[in-house]
Amino acid sequence: MRSTSASGWRRRTARARSSRSRRSSDLKGALRPLNWGWICVIAGPIEQKQTIFLVVGLVACAIVSLPSYRYFAVLAWPAYLGAIGLLVFLLLPFVPESIVKPRNGARGWIDLGFMDLQPAELAKIAYTLAVASYLRARRGSTRTFLGLVAPGVLTFVPIGLMIKQPDLGSAMLFAPALLAMLVVAGARLGHLFLIVALAAMAAPAVYPMLESHQKQRIIGYVGQLRGDRSTASDINFQAFTAQSLVGAGGVSGQPDAKARALVHFNHLPERHNDMIFAVIVCRHGQRGGLMTLGLYGLWVLGALLTAWVSADRFGRILIVGLVAFVAAQVFVNVGMNIGVLPIIGITLPFVSYGGSSLVTVWIMTGLVLNVGLHRTGGPVRRSGGYPDDND
């Protein structure tokens, strides 16, 4: 009797475990389409952690999309100051490395125990909210050079702190975001072109201030453009390896086992992170790469259409700033992987491994949805050189 009872208990326990395993597999299967990276990178602890980050991101997206986005205008300045405070905290010399974890020579992450927080990611959202809030309150001020000073200061503060880490990749994304928001706010294009031209002429002066590894990347990139393969085994190893994997993918990609073998034996650094687009193309070919870019295109188009139909100045500027961040990040990351841009350490939104990056881009998505759900008025009309408001 005891034997029969024990046998029945074991069968029920086995069925329960099997059921939990199926539910876990079903959850991962349902979430995988939301993250192309899992299709291409070997599963394991990374996949489990990224599943958690994705769930957190989706929950954050839903929460952010519920209250009217106008409430976030009130939180813009505290959020901006908080983000600046975190960026300053990273640079404090007395903070131990057990808390601020250096990676590749950069002090850009705070160890929270369960995850590493990257303040530069959160700063993108806080910065966009702050600039959008400022430009809404200063309607028409951007028509003059003097009116561009304050948005410029708001931009250069986080840029300077990120360069100091050093995190040149994240810092570079703030310039296109600022330009996009100023255009929507009604700034004169002639003024913006002049500022861009002056910045381009002043760019060489920044070179001496770069870290040695950043200078090496630029030197390697110039050599790469000239067809010099002598650095393929040292400073350009990552770039040439990524390009070889992109070429190996061809039009239709490689079978799963062969693609994994190619990625493994070529020892591509950061294959789950900055260089994941090369892995996608190796596995799914040019078709998979174009499909990935097409999905980003749909996200950008949907966000811009949401901005177009909103008659609220803050909402429009906010969306365009967020779109500029995502679009610029995709452009730079893909450019790094195919060899048209130098490698500067930028993740691929929605795809690369990393909790801060993934949660941030889903919060951005939630803000875009929020503007769409709480929009007022109709398509944007222009009057007097800058958009009308319905604040």
Residue spans for each PLM region:
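Hydrophobic alpha-helical transmembrane segments of multi-pass inner membrane proteins, especially
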Residues: 29-238, 278-338, 363-367, 382-391
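Re-entrant/interfacial helical elements at transmembrane boundaries that shape
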Residues: 173-174, 257-264, 295, 337-345, ...
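Transmembrane alpha-helices of multi-pass inner-membrane enzymes
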Residues: 35, 339-377
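Extracytosolic (periplasmic/ER-lumenal) interhelical loops and adjacent juxtamembrane/interface segments
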Residues: 239-255
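Long extracytoplasmic/lumenal interhelical loops at the membrane interface
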Residues: 251-287
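N-terminal membrane topogenic signal
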Residues: 15-17, 23-30
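Glycine/serine-rich anion-binding loops at beta->alpha junctions
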Residues: 113-123, 164-166, 254, 343-360
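Short, low-complexity segments with poor structural confidence in diverse proteins
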Residues: 1-4, 13-16
